[in-house]
A protein has these predicted regions:
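Terminal RNA-binding accessory module
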Residues: 1-74, 78, 358, 365
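Rossmann-like S-adenosyl-L-methionine
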Residues: 2-13, 21, 220, 224-235, ...
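A short, glycine/Asx- and small/polar-enriched loop/turn
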Residues: 127-131, 209, 442-443
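Flexible loop/N-cap segments at domain edges
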Residues: 200
Length: 453
């Protein structure tokens, strides 16, 4: 069939050739690509066209005529509706292979780099891994419920469990939902701006078993607040109950004010033997088991002997910095969020690590100032947001010429782009190691080390 003859709502047969970065299958009609969610490479499907653009279109899978050997039955009852996971229909081995392939292809396409990409480091059990949940509260069929948003929507799915959340946090969300309903608490309505409770958030410390519950409310006063807290304390094993007040009409979850309603205002966890105090706001990796794997890759890549000066750009609460400080002469960390820097300093003190310096500011401004002041890195670590490293920071790295750059990435595309700039500037990379931090989703983390040639 010619692509020019395709029409909206038309049913067509085609073979899926590949997966996109967001996990949709890709099939082609006369060279014209159609993106079809919930399909896998090698499958012959019948699909209904739902949208046609000039260069590509979208279709909805109707039937599978030939099933991939990698297809599995998703165990989650609401997988087809929920926007949280996108790869439950693909076997876990298939997911790991998909992520490795994504990294390898991205390195070639964007970075023009011929590097070794080993098999993705996955989990023995890829379920129940998340130590943090942020669950919106709303009315479904006239009842208060807490669940996740439907795909491309703010309609809440009524769900009893989430298979990628840890059991303790999952149970706490369900109990909290019951207790709020018992007292007639009114969920926040996005359209009217009325209601009392917006989100239930949990944080669980994997190594200590401590659990924090956060109630995000529209105002400080909430009907039956004391009774709700009392019931929560009696029915759940909690370390902390915190209230966040967010009175604004916004999609941002947290407001500016925090109030501890019961217990401590932090929970404590450990990574590689380093203790971390975690508040409701702290940035902290959500998969504790794989964080150990990811950071071990960074530690091994740094090859520290105790004589090195290390700079950690985008240091957050100091999680990588403090793991490296055990083996370095001195570690300097920079982060734009001041609260994170305060947390990093507190965590250094908690671990009695005196060979650290943390400063608030933009990495691309602070690190050049350090360089001018005579602070030069033997090893420079970057763990940037999805947009990758700032151009000015990359220029500073090329001027400073640290012996090694350890790059921890959450976006293969910007990793490949930045590696191209660094390799053009005299650095050499031999491999990029993918790490699966988020099973059942398309998100990929990767670690590489670039050596000055």
């Amino acid at each position: 069939m010619e692509a020019s003859l395709l029409k909206k709502n038309q049913s067509i047969e085609l073979t899926i050739e590949d997966l996109t970065h967001d996990g949709s299958g890709v099939g082609k009609i006369d060279g014209y690509p159609l993106f079809i969610p919930n399909t896998l490479p090698g499958e012959k499907v019948t699909a209904k066209i739902i949208k046609l653009n000039k260069n590509y279109g979208f279709a909805r899978m109707e039937t599978i005529e030939s099933v991939s050997a990698d297809r599995v039955e998703p165990p989650c009852a609401v997988y087809s509706k929920c926007g949280g996971c996108s790869l439950q229909h693909l076997s876990y081995d298939g997911q790991l292979a998909f992520k490795r392939n994504q990294v390898e292809e991205t390195m070639k396409r964007i970075g023009k780099l011929n590097v070794d990409v080993p098999e993705t480091l996955g989990m023995e059990n890829p379920w129940r891994y998340r130590n943090k949940s942020q669950v919106p509260v709303g009315f479904v069929n006239g009842k208060l419920t807490a669940g996740f948003y439907q795909k491309r929507s703010h309609a809440i799915i009524d769900m009893s469990t989430c298979l990628i959340h840890n059991e303790q946090g999952d149970f706490a969300v369900q109990k909290t939902r019951e207790i709020l309903a018992k007292y007639g608490t009114e969920p926040y309505d996005e359209k009217t701006g009325k209601g009392d409770i917006r989100h239930i958030m949990t944080r669980f410390a994997h190594t200590t078993g401590q659990l924090m519950l956060v109630l995000v409310t529209t105002k400080e006063r909430m009907p039956f607040k004391n009774e709700i807290v009392q019931d929560l304390v009696e029915q759940l094993e909690l370390t902390s109950i915190v209230q966040n007040i967010n009175p604004h009409k916004t999609n941002v979850i947290f407001g500016d004010r925090m109030k501890t309603l019961w217990g401590k205002d932090i929970i404590e966890d450990t990574i590689h033997g380093i203790r971390f105090a975690i508040s409701a706001r702290s940035f902290y990796q959500v998969n504790p088991l794989q964080t150990e794997v990811l950071y071990q890759q960074a530690i091994d890549a740094a090859e520290l002997t105790g004589e090195e000066t290390v700079i950690d750009a985008y240091c957050g609460i100091g999680s990588i910095s403090l793991c490296l400080a055990k083996k370095a002469k001195h570690v300097y960390g920079v982060e734009i969020v001041d609260q994170a820097i305060q947390d990093a300093r507190a965590n250094a003190e908690l671990n009695e690590l005196t060979n650290t310096t943390f400063e608030t500011g933009k990495a691309e401004e602070v690190i050049p100032a350090w360089y001018k002041a005579g602070i030069e890195a033997d090893v420079l670590v970057v763990d940037p947001p999805r947009k990758g490293c700032d151009e000015k920071l990359l220029e500073t790295i090329l001027a400073m010429k640290p012996k090694k750059v350890v790059y921890v990435s959450c976006n293969p595309g910007t990793l490949a782009r930045d590696m191209k700039i660094l390799t053009d500037g005299g650095y050499v990379a031999k491999k990029v190691q993918p790490v699966d931090m988020f099973p059942m989703t398309t998100h990929i983390e990767a670690v590489t080390v670039l050596h000055l040639n």
